Curated annotation (Swiss-Prot):
A Pfam match: Ribosomal_S2
Similarity-based family: Belongs to the universal ribosomal protein uS2 family.
Name of this chain's protein: Small ribosomal subunit protein uS2
GO molecular function, one term: structural constituent of ribosome
CDD domains for this protein: RPS2 (cd01425)
Cystines in this chain: none
One GO term (biological process): translation
Originating species: Trichlorobacter lovleyi (strain ATCC BAA-1151 / DSM 17278 / SZ)
Length: 257
């Protein structure tokens, strides 16, 4: 299991919240105090809640559930794309389209269009079009790739969602809640924790804090997926052994006859 230490959290600045005048009173249980007009998050709580979130993500991945990483603010974009890709999952890091989950069937049509355009450029079909038409389709492809590239291979709704800054990603969280998709999130002092199933109290603005926590969640996904693969592999080997034993038994009976 990938643990997280107080030292790591401090070095990444996870304890720095928002200005005291910009807070959500529901975050009071997660706040240690205030310093120079800034709320300080209780890192002991962060360690405890992170452990719970990590275990949930790991177990969810072990059951075969997929994860959608969501973080569209500038500070989160790179970490979200890199870590989701590293653990073989999906991400949205540019713009959340309303209905991305609740109207997924329509979004899938746009994904199919993107895949079709990709294929046209890869197999040379695009050369049959005029330069002007090809340029227009290339721009369409770029636009679709920017918004849908991270979910291009997501064929069904995700099993859970990991969110950086649920206040900023309010629509995404609302859609997940409406569909019963569990949400794990980095929750800063200005957020509403009631919307989140697994709260990780922490700084959702600093790049280092975002990168640390996102990488750890990706580790949880990978650990769960690896455990699942071991079980599936041993199950397949067991089935092969059983088939071989049955074949031997049939052969023995045939020779006895």
């Amino acid at each position: 299991m990938s643990s997280i230490s107080m030292k790591e959290l401090l070095e990444a600045g996870v304890h720095f919240g928002h200005q005291t005048k910009r807070w959500n009173p529901k975050m009071k249980p997660y706040i240690f105090g205030a310093r120079n007009g800034i709320y300080i998050i209780d890192l002991q709580k962060t360690v405890r809640y992170f452990k719970s979130a990590y275990n949930f993500v790991k177990e969810s991945a072990e059951q075969g559930n997929t994860v959608l990483f969501v973080g569209t603010k500038k500070q989160a974009q790179d970490s979200v794309a890199e870590e989701a890709t590293r653990c073989g999952q999906y991400y949205v890091n540019q713009r959340w389209l309303g209905g991305m989950l609740t109207n997924f069937s329509t979004v899938k049509q746009s994904i199919e269009r993107l895949k079709k355009l990709d294929a046209m450029f890869e197999d040379g079909t695009i050369e049959a079009y005029t330069k002007k038409e090809a340029l227009k389709m290339d721009k369409e492809r770029e636009k679709l790739e920017k918004v849908l590239g991270g979910i291009k291979n997501m064929n069904k709704l995700p099993g859970m969602m990991f969110v950086i800054d649920p206040k900023n990603e309010e629509i995404a969280v609302q859609e997940a809640k409406k569909l019963g998709i569990p949400v794990v999130a980095i929750v800063d002092t200005n957020c509403d924790p009631d919307m989140i199933d697994h709260v990780i109290p922490g700084n959702d603005d600093a790049i280092r804090a975002i990168r640390l926590l996102t990488a750890k969640i990706a580790d949880a996904v990978q650990e769960g997926a690896d455990a699942r693969n071991v079980v599936l592999q041993s199950g397949a080997e067991g089935a092969d052994d059983l088939e071989e034993a049955l074949a031997d038994e049939v052969a023995c009976e045939a020779s006895a006859d």
